């Protein structure tokens, strides 16, 4: 999810800092030659509970042209396992230079890797095109289970969501001057708006695709913010609702850490970075990097220390990025593995994480990886099973981190301590800055330069599923490798159940903890539950709200199976 380089123009109720040089006005001729694509968001007035019930959307696209029957608009049916809201849109209407358009829709097949709803007109479409519709904000739980916090949610007069969930955008490769406008009159005099494009009304300073707006995150209404004056560049944060921790203090900590990241990655201090925080009733404490910013979540039990590591993790993504290629999940060993590796190392170097906290986080990764029954799954199975099984989903994170720890140790030894993993990562970052390929081939070439053919062989073995075991001294002189008896994670029934809207238990494992706790085939799991964090905690229990024979009741158990010796 990418989108950067923006101009900050205005934000209701806030003073906005002066424009920084990197966000200067568009170059001469830019406005005249590149068509505009403007999104205006108008949230409804909060109800008696403080919830914003709907969001009115207006999209104006210049220079649209499509023949009769040709799809020219689209909206994802599912985005990163988040159920889309195409069926919930109301008041949908579109007009072009000739007047109102009569539209028809068709959906991609349900098994399409990236399915959309497409709109077509009964006549030729000539821009400018104006689209208007209303999106309900229901706070409904994602029917598909585990997923990043992209869906529209509202609380205490604020709302947030990803453009990929609710923006109907031109189906075109054309470049636009993407712009965001906020109409916050109904939300109240103190309402503000922030997106990953910047604070308040913003216009992109370089031509970008319509898809960049789908990869934009929005939060608006009566929301909290840090610092007191939202800057046009650098660090900023907003959150909706009241977290169970001191959000200002946490954002001060994050701003300090962000400064150390800027130095490590040799990035300009003006590089914008925003943090969005909101409540998550299903998988609190997690988050997602989007538009070179971070969306984090919390609930009443979220601890500041845990969220710090999540923030540290997601900020790594902003600088490292992902490998280029079609199989995003299959390539995530790089981005997620590096994020886990550096989420504890960079804060330790910056002095904002203690050696004991570093060790605790390292052992959490190790325990989850070495007890994972599927830790020998080849990397080419990741994409197909990523959302269906938590044991597969965590492999790019855990196996990737252990691979990078092993690689760092070997590079240090081969170079007599003169080089490390840092040098390879910074070389990849520099390639990205210079527009050079940042792909698997580029990575393998760097590894071979350091370690010769052995480096390539170890890399290929990791992808093939061979267990990665760093040397005892891989994490420095203060730590060594030991073993301990730990139990494998065992859900106790078919994990695909948790990704399905009906969530009907099947494939119950006889004698498992789930079976002994009273779970039965045919039980309906009323609400989705997270597993990734529980899988990393040997003592964490699972609680399902079950519906059976018209009655609802909870079932709690420790989802653990056999004991194994783990590092």
Give the ranges of each region predicted by the language model.
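Juxtacatalytic substrate-recognition/specificity segment
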Residues: 224-331
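Bacterial N-terminal signal peptides
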Residues: 13-28
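A surface-exposed beta-strand-loop module
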Residues: 82-149
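Beta/coil-rich, acidic/histidine-enriched accessory regions frequently appended to metallopeptidases
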Residues: 32-41, 58, 88, 434-567
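Glycine/proline-rich low-complexity spacer/linker segments in large multi-domain proteins
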Residues: 135-174
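Surface-exposed beta-strand/loop patches in extracellular or lumenal glycoproteins
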Residues: 52-86, 167-170, 174-185
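Acidic/His/Gly-enriched intrinsically disordered linker/tail segments
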Residues: 328-401, 414, 430-432
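Zn2+-dependent metallopeptidase catalytic core
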Residues: 85-91, 136, 164-167, 171, ...
